[in-house]
């Protein structure tokens, strides 16, 4: 390498001394004259890519005077000279370079590809650093480090963003406390539901069935078992609503409409959060564990699939009692129920719950990306379950004996909009 670099001192001489006979310049001119465009004229075009802000406008490459694109290997160069220098070092090509003109060629954007030795010597002379060119293993390690740093910065930004998100105010904490207590006092078996649940015998849900107009069938024995727990389940939803301060301020007419609209949705949510993946069951009303087919054949049909699917998806959210309670409050205060009088007031109530809910989610700092919008999508799922059940109820009422329906069940679900 020392032998090939011995002509570096000629780079400091005046330009007229670098071309002893002037032949090299004429050769370049002849090449341009024959083709009208040399291969280098393509790379001499201004690059269309990103140009760093630290470069002056049209700042030249220190090697060939083409338009520079950035700071490469400790010098401001164009993409062509950067790539040439990198390939030369990575592939150890410089020992094989030679010059026909004693290593004293002028290097510019026209001549740079015509003498590799002089181009490389000029790269060294202007200060391009060989030690900054990485071999394959070092390049892979550098890319890995860059990616690790990128991931680390993203985590730091996420943590910073979470820390900047508002948490509940003192008034919101009080509202959250009341809603949580309302849920806990009306949620059968509380956190002990797994120890106290009883599994519906497997033979129930498989007996002769009454045909339904839509092709589904109802197992009357299973339906009878479900109706035994439906009245206390509905009563607990009503009690939950009555414990919420903003609900009690509404007119009786609006209270009834809101309760009828949300009852199935809240009961479905309470069942869904008690989904057990090991036994593949939902626990209804905190006491009866049922399988998907049993609930389906017991009268709910496709609604059963929707509730089980919701239970499976909610398992990943790891909701606590407060989050379940606030979700119920949001479902209760739905201002789009048909027949409501004070829709504006109800909408403001729901907004109050939603804001406290969002701030509580910020406080909990879940690890799931976009947790809050994903959780709000479950409100839509629950509303769909309620609408499907209203349609399903009409079929059950036609096909199942009237005496099997508890009075409160009929009172809540009759006359619902489908």
From Swiss-Prot:
Listed name of the protein: Thyroid hormone receptor alpha-B
GO cellular component: nucleus; RNA polymerase II transcription regulator complex
DNA-binding region extent: 61-128
A GO molecular-function annotation: protein heterodimerization activity
Zinc finger (NR C4-type): 61-81, 99-123
Region (Disordered): 1-40
Location of this chain's protein in the cell: Nucleus
One BP annotation, GO: retinoic acid receptor signaling pathway
Family indicated by similarity: Belongs to the nuclear hormone receptor family. NR1 subfamily.
Record note on quaternary structure: Binds to thyroid hormone receptor element (TRE) weakly as homodimers and monomers, but binds TRE with much higher affinity as heterodimers with retinoid X receptors. Can bind DNA as a heterodimer with either rxra or rxrg.
Function summary: High affinity receptor for triiodothyronine (T3).
Chief location of this protein within or outside the cell: nucleus
Protein's UniProt keywords contain Transcription regulation: yes
Ranges where the NR LBD domain occurs: 171-415
Region annotation (Modulating) ranges: 1-60
The record's note on its domains: Composed of three domains: a modulating N-terminal domain, a DNA-binding domain and a C-terminal ligand-binding domain.
Organism for this UniProt entry: Xenopus laevis (African clawed frog)
SMART domains linked: HOLI (SM00430), ZnF_C4 (SM00399)
SUPFAM superfamilies: Glucocorticoid receptor-like (DNA-binding domain), Nuclear receptor ligand-binding domain
């Amino acid at each position: 390498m020392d032998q090939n670099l011995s002509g570096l001192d000629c780079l400091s001489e005046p330009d007229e001394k670098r071309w002893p006979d002037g032949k090299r310049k004429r050769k370049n001119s002849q090449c341009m004259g024959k083709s009208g465009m040399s291969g280098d004229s393509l790379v001499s075009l201004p690059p269309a890519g990103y140009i760093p802000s630290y470069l002056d406008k049209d700042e030249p490459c220190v090697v060939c005077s083409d338009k520079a694109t950035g700071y490469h290997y400790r010098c401001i160069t164009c993409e062509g000279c950067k790539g040439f220098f990198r390939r030369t070092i990575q592939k150890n090509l410089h020992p094989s370079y030679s010059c026909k003109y004693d290593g004293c060629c002028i290097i510019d954007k026209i001549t740079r590809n015509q003498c590799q030795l002089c181009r490389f010597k000029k790269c060294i002379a202007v200060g391009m650093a060989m030690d900054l060119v990485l071999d394959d293993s070092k390049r892979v390690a550098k890319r890995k480090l860059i990616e690790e740093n990128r991931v680390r910065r993203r985590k730091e930004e996420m943590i910073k963003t979470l820390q900047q998100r508002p948490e509940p105010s003192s008034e919101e904490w009080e509202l959250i406390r009341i809603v949580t207590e309302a849920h806990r006092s009306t949620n059968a078996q509380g956190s002990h539901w797994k120890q106290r649940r009883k599994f519906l015998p497997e033979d129930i849900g498989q007996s002769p069935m009454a045909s339904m107009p839509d092709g589904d069938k109802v197992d009357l024995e299973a339906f009878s078992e479900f109706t035994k727990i439906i009245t206390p389940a509905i009563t607990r939803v009503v009690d939950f609503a009555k414990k919420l301060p903003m609900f009690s301020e509404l007119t009786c007419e609006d209270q009834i409409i809101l309760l009828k609209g949300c009852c199935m949705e809240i009961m479905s949510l309470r069942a869904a959060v008690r989904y057990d993946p090991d036994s593949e069951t939902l626990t209804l009303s905190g006491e009866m564990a049922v399988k998907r087919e049993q609930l389906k054949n017991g009268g709910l049909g496709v609604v059963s699939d929707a509730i089980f699917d919701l239970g499976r998806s909610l398992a990943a959210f790891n909701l606590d009692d407060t989050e379940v309670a606030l979700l119920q409050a949001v479902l209760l205060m739905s201002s789009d129920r048909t027949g409501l009088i004070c829709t504006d007031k109800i909408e403001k109530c729901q907004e109050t719950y939603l804001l406290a809910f969002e701030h509580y989610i910020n406080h909990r700092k879940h690890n799931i990306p976009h947790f809050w919008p994903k959780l709000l999508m479950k409100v839509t799922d629950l509303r769909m379950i309620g609408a499907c059940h209203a349609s399903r109820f009409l079929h059950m009422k036609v096909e199942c004996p009237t005496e099997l329906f508890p009075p409160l069940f009929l009172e809540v679900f009759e006359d619902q909009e489908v």
